[in-house]
Structure formats: structure tokens, C-alpha cells
């Protein structure tokens, strides 16, 4: 069998359902040192970002007693909040450019939405701003890897940032901040799984 390029191997891996990935490792990709280094470095980076999001979720819980989504089932955030899709990262019609672009677009969107969390938790300004910087840096890392793999990239310039969402009242702001963090955590978990499965090849 001829060796797979990193792009083709990436497409085959992420094109399979998550359950199938454990049974069909592609050893061909393991020899690409730079690609594996990228994966391991950014797995650690993503884990660090997830930890920071969890710390802010605990702050929302401690400050506003908003701790679980079950408690807020009947409360709809106002306005509708970002829920960035990552469906292209684990479907059979996978395209590497689309998966990585979805991750980058989601990081871009959540970076902007975190402005609402910044207003909600002024005592945690440093952590929120660090989280925004880390999201931007992770997006930049992925863009660089896309370029290294010869994938098409979409430029997401900082000057085109969207303003953070605004809310109709204090309680809606608290609920909105809660769901921004919860949605971001789910997004990061999915992105983390994609990188982790690739790193296990």
C-alpha cells in the first residue's frame, strides 16, 4: 500500500464515525513528525483552554447560582447565542478544509461572545482576556497547519470581530453568560476529540 499524505489520512480518519476510529488506526500518518507535533502541542493547548472555561463556569455558579443546564431548561437566552457547528469533523463526507475552517470559525465566534462574559465577571477580567487570546492563538495555529498541509484557508481578520451579544436585563445577561461558556465547552470537547483521535494513529 502506498503511503497516505497527511491530508488524505486526515480525511479518512475524520470521515469515519468516532466509534470506528479505534479499530482502524492509520500508521502511515504516524511518521509525519511535524503533523504529530502539531497535534500533541494543540491537544495540550485545547486542554488548557477547556480548564479556563471550566474555571469561569465555576465562577458563574458561585456568583449567580447558575450551575447546571437542567436548572435552566425553561429559560431561553436572549438573544440567540452562538452554537458553532463541527459536524464536518466527523461525517463521511469529510473535507479537511471544511473541518479545520469550522474549528477556526467557532473559535473566532466564541472569542467575540466572551466579551459578554467579560462584562458579567469583572473580577475575572484577566482570565477572560487570557481565554480570548488563547482562542485566537489556537485558531492561528490551525491556520498555519492548514497552510503547511496545502489546504485552502479562510482569513478571519481581527478587525472584522463582531460585538458581543447584549441582553435585555441582568438575569438574561447571567443566563447568556452561562450558556456562552457551556456552548464553548461543548465546542472545545468536540475539537479536542478530533485532535486526540488523530494523535492516536
Swiss-Prot record:
GO biological process per UniProt: immune response; positive regulation of cell population proliferation; positive regulation of myeloid cell differentiation
GO CC entries: extracellular space
Signal sequence, start to end: 1-23
Organism superkingdom: Eukaryota
Subcellular location: Secreted
Residues that carry a glycan: 123, 137
GO function terms (MF aspect): cytokine activity; granulocyte colony-stimulating factor receptor binding; growth factor activity
Chief location category: secreted
Gene3D superfamilies with a match to the protein in the record: 1.20.1250.10
Entry keywords, A to Z: Disulfide bond, Glycoprotein, Growth factor, Secreted, Signal
Record-linked PROSITE patterns: INTERLEUKIN_6
SMART domains: IL6 (SM00126)
InterPro entries: 4_helix_cytokine-like_core, GCSF/MGF, IL-6/GCSF/MGF, IL6/GCSF/MGF_CS
Pfam families in the cross-refs: GCSF
Electron transport is among the record's keywords: no
Cysteines paired by S-S bonds: 61-67, 89-99
Family indicated by similarity: Belongs to the IL-6 superfamily.
Function as written in the Swiss-Prot or TrEMBL entry: Hematopoietic growth factor that stimulates the proliferation and colony formation of normal and transformed avian cells of the myeloid lineage.
Protein name: Myelomonocytic growth factor
Organism of this sequence: Gallus gallus (Chicken)
Amino acid at each position: 500500500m502506498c503511503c497516505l499524505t497527511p491530508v488524505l489520512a486526515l480525511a479518512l480518519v475524520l470521515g469515519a464515525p468516532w466509534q470506528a476510529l479505534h479499530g482502524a488506526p492509520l500508521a502511515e500518518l504516524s511518521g509525519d513528525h511535524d503533523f504529530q507535533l502539531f497535534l500533541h502541542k494543540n491537544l495540550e493547548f485545547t486542554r488548557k483552554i477547556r480548564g479556563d472555561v471550566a474555571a469561569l463556569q465555576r465562577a458563574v455558579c458561585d456568583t449567580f447560582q447558575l450551575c447546571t443546564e437542567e436548572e435552566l431548561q425553561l429559560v431561553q437566552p436572549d438573544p440567540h447565542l452562538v452554537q458553532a457547528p463541527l459536524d464536518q469533523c466527523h461525517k463521511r463526507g469529510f473535507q479537511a478544509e471544511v473541518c479545520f475552517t469550522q474549528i477556526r470559525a467557532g473559535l473566532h465566534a466564541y472569542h467575540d461572545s466572551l466579551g459578554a462574559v467579560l462584562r458579567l465577571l469583572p473580577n475575572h477580567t484577566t482570565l477572560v482576556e487570557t481565554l480570548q487570546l488563547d482562542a485566537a492563538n489556537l485558531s492561528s495555529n490551525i491556520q498555519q497547519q492548514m497552510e503547511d498541509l496545502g489546504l485552502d484557508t479562510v482569513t478571519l481578520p481581527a478587525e472584522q470581530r463582531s460585538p458581543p451579544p447584549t441582553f435585555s436585563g441582568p438575569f438574561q445577561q447571567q443566563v447568556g453568560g452561562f450558556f456562552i461558556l457551556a456552548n464553548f465547552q461543548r465546542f472545545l470537547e468536540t475539537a479536542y476529540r478530533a485532535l486526540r483521535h488523530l494523535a492516536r494513529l
